[in-house]
Amino acid sequence: MRLKDISKTATLAWSPRGVNDNQALLALGGYTGTEGSKNSDTLLELWNENPESQKPVGSIDVKTRFYDLAWEKSLDKPMGVIAGSLEDGGIGFWDPAAILKSDEASASIATYKSENGSILGPLDFNRLQPNLLASGDNKGDVWVWDIKHPQQPFALPKQNRSSEVHVVSWNNKVSHILASGNATEYTTVWDVKLKRQVLNLSYLGAAGVSAATGAVNSIAWHPNNATRLATAIDDNRNPIILTWDLRQPTVPQNILTGHQKAALSLSWCPEDPTFLLSSGKDGRAMVWNVETGESLGSFPRSGNWYTKSSWCPSNSNRVAVASLEGKVSIFSIQSTNTDKSQEASIKGATSIDDNEFFNNLPSIAGSQEPSFSLPLAPKWFKVPVGARFGFPNKIVSFSPNSKEVTITSAPDEVEQDEAKSFHSSAKFQTEKEITDFCQKGVEESASEEEAINWKLLMAVSKRASRSKFAELLGYKTLKPKNDEDDSKVDESVAKDSTTPNELSKNANNENYDDDSSFYGKLAESVQEVSIADKKDAEIVKDSFKIFNPEDSDLEKNITEALLTGDVLSAVKACLEEKKISEALFLSTFGGKECRKCVRDAFYELQEHKPSYMRLSACIADNDLQNVVDNAEVSEWKDIFVFICTYATDDEFAPLCSTLGQRLEDLEDEKSIRSAEFCYIASKSLQSYANLWLKQLATSTKTSKAASAYGAYVEQLTKLMDKVSMFRSIVVYKDDELSATKDWKLAGLYEVYIAYAKILSASGKFDDAMSYLNLVPTEFPGAKEEIQRLTMLLEPHAVPPIHQIKQTGYAPVQPKTSQASSILPTVPRTTSYTSPYATTSSHITPADVHPLPPPSTSTTAGWNDAPMLGQLPMRRAAPSMAPVRSPFPGASSAQPAAMSRTSSVSTLPPPPPTASMTASAPAIASPPPPKVGETYHPPTASGTRVPPVQQPSHPNPYTPVAPQSPVAAASRISSSPNMPPSNPYTPIAVASSTVNPAHTYKPHGGSQIVPPPKQPANRVVPLPPTASQRASAYEPPTVSVPSPSALSPSVTPQLPPVSSRLPPVSATRPQIPQPPPVSTALPSSSAVSRPPIATSAGRSSTAASTSAPLTYPAGDRSHIPGNLRPIYEMLNAELQRVSQSLPPQMSRVVHDTEKRLNMLFDRLNSNVLSKPLTDELLALATSLNAHDYQTASNIQTNIVTTLGDQCEHWIVGVTRLITLSKSTT
């Protein structure tokens, strides 16, 4: 990401680490040698990295421009010293602290020139001894300056091939080691202490890579390894960067290719040596992974050379590059919000008027430049050590000194005795278990209140009546109202002692809902008493007047109201005269309102209001909530008994919970126990559990466990036992298991999950699952725990991808590349001979069209190790007509490459007609051997006979054939200098591997098949199969030679008939139809079908490979279950790789995907053999686990043992392994 652009053609130097409180500063000085000088070119400026700052923080005019700048710390200068090689050939020193103040007078420390008057160029400070400065001049001298005594520099001895010194660089670990590079291709390593050369490095090239013959433009030493360095070669035709390890100085450790022109500057990341920054003449600044040799990307390009690039020593997130475009840019290695900014730029560009577009074109192009983010995490962003708890009871950890992840068992803090007390949530299922548990709680109670609570739990478990609850609080058995005074109470009610619900109904007089108040019952009582005493008191039956003259006006009004049925008016008239008795008597004939009116008036007339009046009023109004809310909470026992006596079943639990909440709010120990009593009586799990959860935090302080965690587990176990028992007693059914939010028991659910984790850590997985089953699946954290336990308890529930068998392939240890271990390989050619084509003795080579070559040979940053021991390849000369054999009647077959015996031509007869019976075709006799050859008959197994020694006098004029991809990767060893058997026959040009499923049509005229280009990515293709052994340019014979035509001195012994007959199999290979019979000779030989294998097993597998697809290409819905993991893992890895690779590799990814789709199509049609699919499954498993060594071993085994079943898709598998390894 571009942070800042400074308009200046300059050379640069970052401030060293530890200077300016590690706030990075960038020194810029005008770059010499550029045209169109400006006044600002002679300014020495200091800039900060703040993108918003558009002016230097300090500058002075030094009246000169610079070849190079260097900045290092100093013992007597807090900001260090800046050194610069001047335009006039001298060297100057400046104080950055004075430059920050723009103090020109005190900024300059000193200026010196070399003794021989040479022009000094490159500079570099010694980081271990900052007083030492190295520089090189245009006469080939390397100078060492001591800034303590700058008047006395000394020069190192001149090299034999002295020329202008382009670069000097001090070693970062050994203070007296210096490297320099000049206009020759040599990099010289110096021992400054001994003032002598230690080593000269140069690269003479290897197979496929040209020699590094240009000048050395830049040298960068590894920050941490004293023997490693990188050099940039000034060769536009072969722009390479070489990394060296001086322990093996004869060959570079790696070759970095990707620049289009020579690199001019190198800078190693100071904090993570994995990264190397380079910039060059192609206007590119690239970042490399030095360990793998691949390019990680490049910063936005410049329109001119990038002359110098440098990683910031104090902030490795920043890099600076200077270009001849007149710009110094500061970049970040991480881009942010690039997509949004580019989208906004594109929208803005589309809205610009056509007339103004070209005026804004530079800014538009700059805003849409490609962004760059480092795809690998730098070392300073990586976590050096870490650990995570795993499941069950595991610790996964890693350390900085190992790339392996360690999995260990976490120490179990739960004692064995405590673990024995763990139980499932279904522990309390019988009455005896509950009773024993409650009795144990009574015995272990620390207070009387706690013991009463345990007794109440026992009573609730036995379905005791409310009378039992009152007895526990010291009250006698509850009785119905008037039980002691009224002898006329129903005997069934008097004898009832079953349940508190029925008892409360009787005590509550049963009919309170309508006219069941005390006064209504009073009327009934009066009526009952009247009827009972009817014999003793008869109603007066004398005559009377309704309106008596002696009655007062009030009495007459009351009488009139009664006659008309207005009882309420009569009652109110009595109350106005304070005739309470009369009003009370009259209200017995009225409704509720009459009775309430009398009751309220009576209550208001009482000067002293006793509590029984308040209670009676609440009872009469059925307002028990009034008593529970307003009575003194210290009398909670009386309130509880009042609730037991008068509350209905529906009212009982809410009223008890309200009373318990009032007690819980007091927050003292005794009140908490009292609240617990009320919650138990109400059978409210929510209130009871919340109270226990509050007690859990304080109960651990009183535990006698050895540790705080042990105390927590102990108290949590007791809580779970209480909750489990309570759920069993009340037969609790949770209605919120399907809820998704607003859970009333959320606190209890969290404890369930925590306790399940403790049980899992102790190995009690079934018990843990029993508690998780009590938690809603949508509760946070529940689903994950259930899934993890399910995987342990039900292994069959794990997806099949995790049941893949482990591969038996061991990783191959990497070998050190040696120059002598790399040998050239001889190309192998392939062709097919048509059994139905008319042959001729005068035939030109077949016009075979090879597969399309790659359009470009650029590697796009993809590098291989250098190949040594093989000369550069030359383009093959045009093919010559084959030389006829001197033997009469012999065929003119040209020997194929890689073979020291004559090829055997097998000409089966035409296919049988309908009238013919199935019979084995006859095998033709092979041609006689040529001069100097020994005849070797074909073997029954179809394998080639080992070749015998060829003459050791090759034709020096024979052109060297280029390698084909098949030959380059062939694992069949061959002699590096194998000449053809005929010294005048040129070596055949290697052709591309021909797929047996393709049929090529012959064309008229003789055409030379061009050699294939070097592939963009070197992969390991499959070796040629048995059907690809013959030469592509082998002319077919005119006829089958008879034994009499053979030389008498050489009599071939034909193999037995059984070995020459094709096997009879139910599945026959696909054979192309013969062409129409024609008497005319074809202009060139037709490409033939593959010969039939001579092994039944190989025939069947080859047939299955070439079998037609059952389903259309691209369909993946019919892949069998046992093969689907192959598809899923390979496809997932392909998608990961395609997102990780840079855009330059898109063609490689596309080709890999196309080849893998061929494999997926065959998996979908289930046409691959079981041995092959087993190997592919093991390969995919290793690749998915990033075990690339094992995956490569399996791929090699597939190619070597099952190669005849492999098609073009094997190249895609091989390439996927390579790409996956490079992007991990």
Swiss-Prot record:
It is a peripheral membrane protein. Keywords: Cytoplasmic vesicle, Endoplasmic reticulum, ER-Golgi transport, Membrane, Phosphoprotein, Protein transport, Repeat, Transport, WD repeat. Residues 495-510 have a biased composition (Polar residues). The keyword DNA damage does not apply. WD repeats lie at residues 18-57, 61-104, 114-155, 160-200, 211-254, 258-300, 302-341, 388-410. This is Protein transport protein sec31. GO terms for cellular component: COPII vesicle coat; cytoplasm; cytosol; endoplasmic reticulum exit site; endoplasmic reticulum membrane. Residues 480-512, 840-866, 879-1116 are annotated as: Disordered. The lineage of its organism: Eukaryota, Fungi, Dikarya, Ascomycota, Taphrinomycotina. It comes from Schizosaccharomyces pombe (strain 972 / ATCC 24843). GO terms for molecular function: structural molecule activity. Residues 914-923, 960-976, 1035-1065, 1093-1107 have a biased composition (Low complexity). The keyword Protein transport applies. GO terms for biological process: COPII-coated vesicle cargo loading; endoplasmic reticulum membrane organization; endoplasmic reticulum organization; endoplasmic reticulum to Golgi vesicle-mediated transport; protein transport. The gene is sec31. InterPro entries: SEC31-like, SRA1/Sec31, WD40/YVTN_repeat-like_dom_sf, WD40_repeat_CS, WD40_repeat_dom_sf, WD40_rpt. Component of the coat protein complex II (COPII) which promotes the formation of transport vesicles from the endoplasmic reticulum (ER). The coat has two main functions, the physical deformation of the endoplasmic reticulum membrane into vesicles and the selection of cargo molecules. It comes from the Eukaryota. The COPII coat is composed of at least 5 proteins: the sec23/24 complex, the sec13/31 complex, and the protein sar1. sec13 and sec31 make a 2:2 tetramer that forms the edge element of the COPII outer coat. The tetramer self-assembles in multiple copies to form the complete polyhedral cage. Interacts (via WD 8) with sec13. Belongs to the WD repeat SEC31 family. Its main location: membrane.
